[in-house]
């Protein structure tokens, strides 16, 4: 069975386009908020997962402080937790809501929040 001339022209074109790199527009996910943001994280992270606990209403700064660079902790050894301003350090970091809900983010930005 021979292919029609139309299919013979379309099949190579489809194969060529499927190998082309995505444009900047297709890599940008747009504004993702709430459930849309969580669903996008599930897709971006896959089996690696990401940190999300819908039962927590407030950010647990004690758990997040464990992820601060060791150098920061060593520089501030002599001070107690209240005076080193862990909350200020965390506020200065760009969060996923600011990055993907208030602004546009890409799939690569989402992958930064995977485990």
Curated annotation (Swiss-Prot):
Region forming the signal peptide: 1-26
SUPFAM superfamilies, per the entry: Insulin-like (SSF56994)
Domain of life: Eukaryota
Family annotation (PROSITE patterns): INSULIN
Keywords in alphabetical order: Carbohydrate metabolism, Cleavage on pair of basic residues, Disulfide bond, Glucose metabolism, Hormone, Secreted, Signal
Disulfide bonds: 33-101, 45-114, 100-105
Compartmental location: Secreted
GO molecular function: hormone activity
Protein's UniProt keywords contain Acyltransferase: no
Biological process, per Gene Ontology: glucose metabolic process
Record PANTHER family: INSULIN, INSULIN/INSULIN GROWTH FACTOR
Family under the similarity heading: Belongs to the insulin family.
Function: Insulin decreases blood glucose concentration. It increases cell permeability to monosaccharides, amino acids and fatty acids. It accelerates glycolysis, the pentose phosphate cycle, and glycogen synthesis in liver.
Listed name of the protein: Insulin
Taxonomic lineage from the root: Eukaryota, Metazoa, Chordata, Craniata, Vertebrata
């Amino acid at each position: 069975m021979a292919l029609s001339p139309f299919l013979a022209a379309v099949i190579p074109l489809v194969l060529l386009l499927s190998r082309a790199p995505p444009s900047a527009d297709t890599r940008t996910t747009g504004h993702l908020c709430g459930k849309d943001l969580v669903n996008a994280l599930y897709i971006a992270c896959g089996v690696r997962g990401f940190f999300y606990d819908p039962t927590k209403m407030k950010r647990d700064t004690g758990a997040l402080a464990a992820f601060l660079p060791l150098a920061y902790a060593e520089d501030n050894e002599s001070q107690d937790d209240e005076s080193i301003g862990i909350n200020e350090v965390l506020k200065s970091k760009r969060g996923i809501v600011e990055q993907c809900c208030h602004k546009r983010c890409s799939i690569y930005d989402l992958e930064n929040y995977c485990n």
